[in-house]
Amino acid sequence: MQLTTSQQMQTNFLTTNKHHLLKYTNGLIWCWWLFVISLVLASSTFRGFFLGTINIVNFVFWILALIFGVAVAFINGVLSSELKENSVFQEEQKRFFLGFFFPQMAFCNALWLKLKLSYLNSERENLLEKIKQKLKKLTLSVFVVWGIYCVLATSIYLPNALRILNIYQIPNLIALINNRLSEILPDGNRYFLGHSSFAFHYYEIVSRIPFLVFFIIPTITLITLGCYLFAYLRFINSNKLRKPLSTLSIVIMLTDVVGIIQWIIIDILLIWLNVPFVIFVIFWVIKLVLPLAMIGTFVSSLTIYKKVTSKEWLAIKEEQINLTTMNININMGEQSSKNMNSFENHESNERNSLQIYQQHSSMMSETKRKQSSLSYDARILLPKSPYNTKKTLFLIIFFSIISLILATIGSVFISFAIVQISIPFYVIGGVIWFFTFISL
């Protein structure tokens, strides 16, 4: 495969510094995982803060998370400075600059760079087949995690929601909400921190360990799988994959921003500075981004699976081959120009120019033969697309929007601990999961 001058410079730089860059890349990925594990463990012991007693284990895990988060930012900065030495990586500086502030974006940068280093000398056609299999496995993993999340969440919430709805009739429930609001708003922060039986009605339903296993871990797993999908799509860099790539980019940025704001609100403003109740409300509003991020990741994975299992993947491969052909033409044009200049000074180079022309002609015919062969093979071997119409995808997006609206309503009820009305979000999530596997 011929490369343009800039691509050749990039490849030479990565080949020369491969082991050096891999060391920092693997270090950033390990720090990310330690950062996530620390956050998960800190979240599982979070109850101690609200009960008025500082849990030393919780405090240690938050400190570890802070240390590993800073390490991720530091290593991302080192990688940025390393790549900046090569002019062909100037376009990546914006992404690495964002990664300095947002750990999830830094993780995506590291995954992308590791892919570049791992597949330096691979043939493009074979490489695309490997990536196709990776994308299929990742999207199927997203489906499975989403399904497990919906089933477990429904099994936890449904019995308790039915029990509470049997206790409170709807008119009485509305009156109870108004009474609770009138009690909370005058001095909401003291009320929440002082009345653990009310504030932790949620934890009476779901203890800390099930909350960790059934909610935190699936959420982080799903968003992390989205990071891997983002890295592979960015590595392919195809115009036909721009929509899922843009969606995943927005998801990553939203979860990064929400994570930082939530950290500030929970650890600094709400706990240590004893701020008004409005901060607590903002905290619950921010948490709505997580369901949105999970839905965005899920819908993006559907789009990706559709493309890699249909004839659209053929178009992506042809696009990549056309880019390769264009690069060949550019290189041959540059080489021909050099040879023509040399011919003016040395007539003996005429034979070399003829040989180059013959090589160029044979290379072009070989490329066309591969393209036609690829098109013929793809028409025979590629399976029929499971999405013959847009009906299934429309239903999934429609149900996702409805579930997000219900989650918004339900989060208010959860924060006031009156009724677990967010159960429709999980039920509809299960319906989405069911429709997805039927359509595959």
Curated annotation (Swiss-Prot):
Membrane topology (UniProt): Multi-pass membrane protein
Protein name from the UniProt record: Uncharacterized protein MPN_085
Record keyword Transmembrane helix present: yes
TM region positions: 26-46, 59-79, 96-116, 138-158, 211-231, 241-261, 263-283, 284-304, 394-414, 418-438
UniProt KW Transport keyword: no
Family to which this protein belongs: To M.pneumoniae MPN_087.
Cellular component, GO annotation: plasma membrane
Localization: Cell membrane
Species per Swiss-Prot/TrEMBL record: Mycoplasma pneumoniae (strain ATCC 29342 / M129 / Subtype 1) (Mycoplasmoides pneumoniae)
Keywords: Cell membrane, Membrane, Transmembrane, Transmembrane helix
